Each structure stands twice: as structure tokens, then as C-alpha cells.
Amino acid sequence: MVTQYIPLKEKYEKEVVPKLMKEFNYRNINQVPRIEKIVINMGIGEGSRNADLLNKHLKELAAITGQKPVITKAKKSISNFKIRKGMNVGLKVTLRGLRMWNFLYKIANIVLPKVRDFRGLNPNSFDGHGNYSFGLTEQFVFPEITPDQSPKTQGMDIVIVTTAKTDAEAFKLLEFLGFPFKR
């Protein structure tokens, strides 16, 4: 296996773990919360009727994450949205390992500072089990995407799944990793 320098993973191991052990009085290093995976979801309403649009967004999400997305299908028919069961309605990527750490670094240090009118992440977006969710309204904040190559603006939901038992532990984990939260 190729070892690769990942700044955020090294920061986690050398700085964040000791801080969390001290703050929450953990006796064992295995008690310290860590990030398990990141799930990126992109709902594409027109994707069910426009295969070309779906493929363009599929390539964009693959460029952003470095991994091929899975096409999500509708679980049931909804007549108001003109959706039938089994239609393509979105894209999903689950990142683990090196790609996860690289994506986290990119989000915290490159993407979030480029978001227009960004004043920090909402600290109330934890789910009660230590997982954090937030959304981006456009994909152009990623350096891999330029506005002229994309057919339309498309947002995405990002879920950071941690092993933290409480929201306070997960908040401190993400804060020590450099995520900008509102005060």
C-alpha cells in the first residue's frame, strides 16, 4: 500500500486526539471519536427525465470526490413530482480512508472559504448521535468545477459520520480539525 501524506489525518493523530483525550478524560485512545465516513448526496429532480443532465452531474460529482457516484432511484411513485418508482432521482458517494481525509481538508480549507456570504457552519446541525450534516447550494465552490462547463447550478448534502457518542464530542472533533462554526 502506498503511504501518502495527508495533512488533516496527521493533524488528527498528533494534535486532535491528545486534545480530545484531555478535554473528555478518555483513558483509552480507542475511546476518542474519529470520522468514519462522509456521504455526499446530490438530488437531481430533472435527472429522471434528462439522462444527459444526470451524466454531467455524475461526472462533476466524480471530479469533486475522486470516486464514481452511485445513481439513487425513487423508492416509490409520487405523482405531484411526476416520479415513478425506480426512476433515477439523485447521486450518492460514500468516502472512506484517504479520499475521506482529502475531501475533509478540501471542504474546511478551500471550499467553505469560497462560499458567498459564509459566516460559519451551524452548530445545531448535529443529529443527536454525533453526526454532522450541512448543505452547499452550488457546486462551483469546488476548484474542479467551472461555471461554464456545468449545465446548471446544483446543490448537495454532505453528512460527516463520526464514532462520537454525543454531539458535544463530535463538535469538538470537527472544531479541532479546523471546521469554522458560528459563535
Swiss-Prot record:
GO terms for molecular function: rRNA binding; structural constituent of ribosome; tRNA binding. Keywords: Ribonucleoprotein, Ribosomal protein, RNA-binding, rRNA-binding, tRNA-binding. This is Large ribosomal subunit protein uL5. The gene is rplE. The keyword Lipid biosynthesis does not apply. It comes from the Bacteria. The keyword RNA-binding applies. Pfam families: Ribosomal_L5 (PF00281), Ribosomal_L5_C (PF00673).
